[in-house]
Amino acid sequence: MAKRKEENFCSPENAKRPRQEELEDFDKDGDEDECTISFTNGTSTLTAAEVGIIESIQLRNFMCHSMLGPFKFGSNVNFVVGNNGSGKSAVLTALIVGLGGKAVATNRGSSLKGFVKAGQNSADISITLRNRGDDAFRANVYGDSIVVQQHISVDGSRSYKLKSEKGTVVSTRKEELIAILDHFNIQVDNPVSVLTQEMSKQFLQSKNEGDKYKFFMKATQLEQMKEDYSYIMETKERTKEQINQGEERLTELKRQCLEKEERFQNIAGLSTMKTNLEYLKHEMAWAVVNEIEKQLNAIRDNIKIGEERAAKLDRKMEEQQVRLNDAEKKYKDIQDKLEKISEETNARAPECMALKTDVIARTRAFNDAEVLYNRSLNEYKALKKDGEQLCKRIEELKKSTDQSLEPERLERQKRICWLKEKVKALQDQEHTVNQEAEQFEQAIEKDKQEHGRVRKEDIEVRHALNYNQRQLKELKDSKTDRLKRFGPHVPALLEAIDDAYRRRQFTHKPIGPLGACIHLRDPELALAIESCLKGLLQAYCCHNHADERVLQSLMKKFYPPGTSRPQIIVSEFRDEVYDVRLRAAYHPEFPTVLTALEIDNAVVANSLIDMRSIETVLLIKNNSVARAVMQSQKPPKNCREAFTADGDQVFAGRYYSSESTRPKFLSRDVDSEISDLETEIENKKGHIITLQQRLSALEKDIKRNEELLKRCQLHYKEIKMKIRKNISEIRELENIEEHQSVDIATLEDEAEENKIKMQMVEKNMEQQKENMENLKSLKIEAENKYDTIKLKINQLSELADPLKDELNLADSEVDSQKRGKQHYEDKQKEHLDTLNKKRRELDMKEKELQEKMSQARQICPERIEVKKSASILDKEINRLRQKIQAEHASHGDREEIMKQYQEARETYLDLDNKVRTLRRFIKLLEEIMTHRYKTYQQFRRCLTLRCKLYFDNLLSQRAYCGKMNFDHKNETLSITVQPGEGNKASFNDMRALSGGERSFSTVCFILSLWSIAESPFRCLDEFDVYMDMVNRRIAMDMILKMADSQRFRQFILLTPQSMSSLPSSKLIRILRMSDPERGQTTLPFRPVTQEEDDSAS
């Protein structure tokens, strides 16, 4: 509730007449104990109240009621009766809330939103206040009644409509409602005006006597008077400070006034110096014109030199463009040669592999045939030798006549046959072991080749794993700082750039990395755009070469020697993007790199256009469609190349696959990339484990085969030794001269059989030799073909190596020429800017010359010859002006000094008058406040005594006694009640009373406050809930008696009783509430903070 107007405190005569008479009686007695009041049952005023009482209330969707009212209240006593839940308390709550009270003041909820019926969007309250008679509020606007309508939304906000008697909306501002309540002296947050059952319970059970005192002060509005007094005293102290400041200012003004008066007496003429000053000004005007003319001539000379230099730079740029075209043509020619060689090499690779496989197969077939032939040859030689020995032996036997040693010879012959069979078996075993050794050697060679291949694959997979792990770390770091995608040092480098820019080391702050300054319109094109821009995504832009040198020095701190640094692009910063509409590529279905990017910074867009011509590069997601657009038909106009979603680069006649499989810098879905990388890393780790297992298995196979090979070789040696030993023994036996008789016929048969075997072996050997020769020729033919194709491939490789070196040199040359061209373009641009600046300066100087000449003619129409410079004349003018000012300072101008003197005197007199007025005001205010404070203290004592007497008188009607002790110094109030006779029971705190006794005492206390408090209506909720029948009847009689004596006030009493025993009177109106709907027993409240209610209010 807003403060009352100050005149309410300053004008005691505005109070009600009865109170004024009582105060005068109190002043006459002079002592509180002697102050008496007469209680009468007669009516003090028989007229009904004209302003401020409640005429009607109507509720909609309020608390748990869809519609209540309208309730028409009488002008005096109104009983609202009904069972619990019927809406009695809702009417009282609506009265408090509807007249601007806060939700917490109702003790029914902590937020306005809790008063909206469950399931509804809003609630409405309509209260009609009486507005008649002489004290009506803006009667010409509102009429005889004021309708206050409040709309409460479900979110806790509320709005007001203040309507006239005719229903016209007069205002929607809360300030208007506060003015109405102040005018009618209505305080809805004053518990004396509206006392809820919960407020009464809290007050009477409060242990803090200071709270009761505050209750009393607020109910009687003494608290408001006290606050008004304090405010006036603070205002008085501030006014005293203003008076003290004014007195200090008066002293200073008086001193200044005397000084002005003294200076006025010492004024002298200064005409000669003023004449000289005017002549110097004439010379100064034309001296300025002379200097501007000299500056114009110098600027014209500079422009002429600049135009010649611009033409020279144009020629150099044309020469540089020719060199760049030659370098690009050379690079393209070498690149075409390399591509042709690469295509031819790739085309011959499958044939080479097939021929190599054929050579290996034919070599193996030839070796097998050669082994068979050698074996047959050895067998033939052995048979031949055996035949020769048999023939020799037969001859020897035929000559021998001695048959005595025949048994020994036969034994030797038998031994020889056995040894030969053993040699034959050993030779077969030798052949088998030799074949096994060859198989082991081939297996070892094959395993070693496989081991080398797997080992190489393992190294490649490990390199890829390390790269993926670094990429994963960068991605995880980029989740917290996206800039780390462009390198781990980038955030620190950007901080260093910011710091250097703050220290003004840069002309313009460098921009970069460029990848952080662009955004994709289509995330699926991320890899394509990265493949196109490559290192430019990590590049930085500088305005000039001075900024580039500063940035290079900063980069040295973060990029160690030997490591690659980001590229720096030097180009003057512009605020607008280049107009590329005439040279940009266009396709109705596919965007260019420029249109596929969102680039907010014009410098970034211009740099990418300069360095990569992104307006001419198309982006086509599908590979086959890209080939069709660029190669199967004529490429779109102005389109040089295209990139696919897989990062492949497509030219009109070439196609290059991308080395990358995923974007590194421009991907938006970092979590998905991290997940994919983690999966790929796990797969690679699993692959490495598989490769390691494969390597281990191959190493075991190689070791096992090598051991088996050693065993075979050792076995082979042992067999060889056995064969040599047996052959040696056979030869020894055959060389022994046998003189024994032998069976010549048997030997001859054996010789014949040996001859037949020799023929068979010879025939077989000839076939094997023929087969071997055929296989040899086939092997040689395959080797020749393989060597031929291998030689061609090696020749192509030898041709490609110098071409690669030439391509690198040509690429460097192209970059060098581009930098050279960019250098001249930058210089030309910088020079043209300077030249244009000079031209603009020339225009400005010409305009300035015209202005200065016009000004000079106004000062001196005839041009005069000036020999002194403008600076010298300026110094002379300043010296003369200072001399004149010094004379003015010592003497001054008469009119000016007179004017200053009059102003100082008037200021002094005005301030002196104000200070005197304030002094009189403060003196009068102190006298008034002293009198008013005494009156306030007397008024407080009178109200205190009246409250005590009313309380005692009301308690005595039930044979109770009570005490009210006021301590105004400590601001406390203590209340005690004695239920029985004064000498039969002791005084007790009200909390010790029974429910009925406490309720009765509460009514007595409230009636006491009602008797001394000002308010057009009083509301009391369930005042008799704890009373027995006797106390209820007595309390009712007391309330009706008071109401009858105060017909100018309205009483609204809420009770669950039927009130059927009330006397019949036109002053009493009973409003009966309908019983609540079945099941409706609680209200839909929920806890809300105090701040919500305050904000809603």
UniProtKB/Swiss-Prot annotation:
Skewed-composition ranges (Acidic residues): 22-32
Biased composition (Basic and acidic residues): 1-21, 815-839
Gene3D superfamilies linked to this entry: P-loop containing nucleotide triphosphate hydrolases (3.40.50.300)
PTMs per UniProt: Phosphorylated. Sumoylated by NSMCE2/MMS21.
Cell compartments where the protein resides: Nucleus; Nucleus speckle; Chromosome; Nucleus, PML body
One GO term of the biological process aspect: DNA damage response
Stretches of the chain forming a coiled coil according to its record: 232-348, 376-457, 668-920
Keyword NADP included in the entry's annotation: no
Annotated InterPro entries: P-loop_NTPase, Rad50/SbcC_AAA
A GO CC term attached to the entry: chromosome, telomeric region
Domain of life: Eukaryota
Region (Disordered), start-end ranges: 1-32, 813-839, 1078-1097
MF terms in GO: ATP binding; ATP hydrolysis activity; DNA secondary structure binding; ubiquitin protein ligase binding
Sorted UniProt keywords: ATP-binding, Chromosome, Coiled coil, DNA damage, DNA recombination, DNA repair, Isopeptide bond, Nucleotide-binding, Nucleus, Phosphoprotein, Telomere, Ubl conjugation
Chain residue ranges for the region called Flexible hinge: 458-667
Binding residues for ATP: G82, N83, N84, G85, S86, G87, K88, S89
Covalent cross-link Glycyl lysine isopeptide (Lys-Gly) (interchain with G-Cter in SUMO2) as placed by the record, residue numbers: K274, K779
Record-listed Phosphoserine modification sites: S675
Keyword Glycoprotein: no
Entry text on domains: The flexible hinge domain, which separates the large intramolecular coiled coil regions, allows the heterotypic interaction with the corresponding domain of SMC5, forming a V-shaped heterodimer.
Family: Belongs to the SMC family. SMC6 subfamily.
Oligomer status and interactors: Forms a heterodimer with SMC5. Component of the SMC5-SMC6 complex which consists at least of SMC5, SMC6, NSMCE2, NSMCE1, NSMCE4A or EID3 and NSMCE3. Interacts with NSMCE1. Interacts with NSMCE2. Interacts with SLF1. Interacts with SLF2. Interacts with RAD18. Interacts with SIMC1.
Protein purpose: Core component of the SMC5-SMC6 complex, a complex involved in repair of DNA double-strand breaks by homologous recombination. The complex may promote sister chromatid homologous recombination by recruiting the SMC1-SMC3 cohesin complex to double-strand breaks. The complex is required for telomere maintenance via recombination and mediates sumoylation of shelterin complex (telosome) components.
Name of the protein in question: Structural maintenance of chromosomes protein 6
Annotated gene: Smc6
